[in-house]
């Protein structure tokens, strides 16, 4: 899925031609990862008049912010007292509009080869090919997949009655809902959907949680008020009728297996992060993270940079704002590869007419 996004939406609404199996696209910068840091990397490169293409294994823009906590508040973005993951993504997309980046979604990088001319040949899992002067790895924890419910055959209901994330909460209103898991996501959605779903049953393998104590206390209070149920146990089987999931079989801590009617199952077992093909690029790794310098956030391979949660260096902090800082220095570090004969001058968006032109804004006149 290849697209350009000229407005702040995080889904694929504007198509742009790809080149699966065709001639490689010759570009200046390729960003791997369309999360907040990858999106801000587009902005910092754009200020230096470097156009970027972005690859992401997900089919939507926003990375973990949109995949894991689109509606959860974020409090530590400078000058933004509070925003959700989706709002942060939408604002970043709005911010990078002037630079018209091209997104290649739902695909992973499968091949990276250094060419004799110093550029890189890159190919994705969908056959999209590039020849690029620089690569920026902003892949967070790498590609990640939800840990799934291990019940034989139940996967056929995924996306219909079995879900690993909530895209539309109203989908579960008026339904008999089972929520499985013991972390914050499981508790948060349980509490949110009580009173909206027809019934809510929470199932966890033990009577202990990896979640905020206040959420656990609220859940137990709702159980006492008969607003929902909590059960210690594990799902071991299911029943269906005419291709529709109708019941699950839950084995409790007492060893007894009980049948439970169900319309939908929400599973929150966490995510399994994987570096995937990145681990095979010849990069220096430390505990599955990419080592970089702190001057340019360049890896051991000249021309390949790593920003955000995927990198490591002394004093590293996995914060979105740290990733933004890294993206700025990485852009300046990459400029000599793209403009070898051009001296890069430090300019400020507050005062530079050149940057105002790049951003498509008018230069203010002060009396």
UniProtKB/Swiss-Prot annotation:
Subunit structure comment from the entry: Homodimer.
Listed Gene3D superfamilies: FAD/NAD(P)-binding domain
Protein keywords: FAD, Flavoprotein, NADP, Oxidoreductase
Keyword Translocase: no
Binding site for FAD: 56, 64, 69, 109, 144, 309, 350
Superkingdom in the source lineage: Bacteria
Enzyme Commission no: 1.18.1.2
Record's cofactor remark: Binds 1 FAD per subunit.
HAMAP family: FENR2
Principal EC category: oxidoreductase
InterPro entries in alphabetical order: FAD/NAD-bd_sf, FAD/NAD-binding_dom, Fd--NADP_Rdtase_type_2, Ferredoxin-NADP_redctase_2
Name the UniProt record assigns to this protein: Ferredoxin--NADP reductase 2
Cofactor (UniProt): FAD
Family: Belongs to the ferredoxin--NADP reductase type 2 family.
Any one Gene Ontology molecular-function term assigned to this protein's record: NADP binding
Keyword hit for Disulfide bond: no
Catalyzed reactions: 2 reduced [2Fe-2S]-[ferredoxin] + NADP(+) + H(+) = 2 oxidized [2Fe-2S]-[ferredoxin] + NADPH
């Amino acid at each position: 899925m290849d697209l350009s996004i000229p407005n702040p939406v995080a889904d694929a609404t504007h198509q742009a031609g790809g080149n699966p199996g065709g001639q490689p696209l010759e570009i200046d910068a390729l960003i791997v990862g369309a999360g907040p840091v990858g999106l801000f990397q587009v902005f910092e490169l754009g200020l230096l008049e470097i156009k970027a293409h972005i690859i992401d294994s997900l089919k939507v823009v926003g990375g973990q912010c949109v995949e894991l906590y689109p509606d959860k508040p974020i409090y530590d973005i400078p000058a933004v007292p509070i925003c959700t993951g989706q709002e942060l993504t939408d604002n970043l997309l709005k911010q990078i509009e002037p630079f018209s980046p091209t997104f290649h979604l739902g695909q992973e990088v499968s091949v990276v080869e250094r060419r004799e001319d110093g550029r890189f040949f890159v190919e994705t899992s969908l056959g999209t090919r590039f020849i690029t002067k620089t690569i920026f790895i902003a892949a967070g924890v790498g590609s990640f997949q939800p840990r799934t419910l291990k019940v034989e055959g139940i996967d056929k209901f995924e996306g219909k009655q079995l879900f690993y994330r909530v895209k539309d909460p109203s989908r579960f209103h008026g339904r008999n809902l089972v929520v499985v898991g013991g972390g914050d996501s499981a508790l948060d959605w349980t509490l949110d959907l009580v009173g909206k779903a027809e019934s809510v049953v929470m199932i966890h393998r033990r009577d202990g949680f990896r979640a905020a104590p206040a959420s656990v206390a609220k859940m137990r209070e709702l159980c006492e008020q008969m607003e929902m149920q909590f059960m210690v146990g594990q799902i071991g089987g299911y029943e269906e009728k005419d291709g529709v999931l109708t019941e699950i079989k839950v084995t409790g801590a007492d060893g007894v297996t009980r049948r439970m009617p169900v319309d939908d199952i929400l599973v929150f077992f966490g995510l399994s992060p994987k570096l995937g093909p990145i681990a095979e690029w010849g990069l220096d790794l430390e505990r599955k993270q990419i080592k970089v310098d702190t001057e340019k956030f360049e890896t051991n391979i000249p021309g390949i940079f790593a920003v955000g949660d995927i990198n490591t260096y002394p004093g590293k902090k996995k914060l979105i704002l740290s990733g933004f800082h890294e993206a700025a220095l990485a852009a300046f570090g990459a400029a000599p590869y793209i403009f070898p004969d051009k001296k890069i001058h430090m300019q400020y968006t507050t005062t530079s007419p050149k940057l105002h032109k790049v951003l498509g804004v008018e230069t203010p006149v002060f009396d």
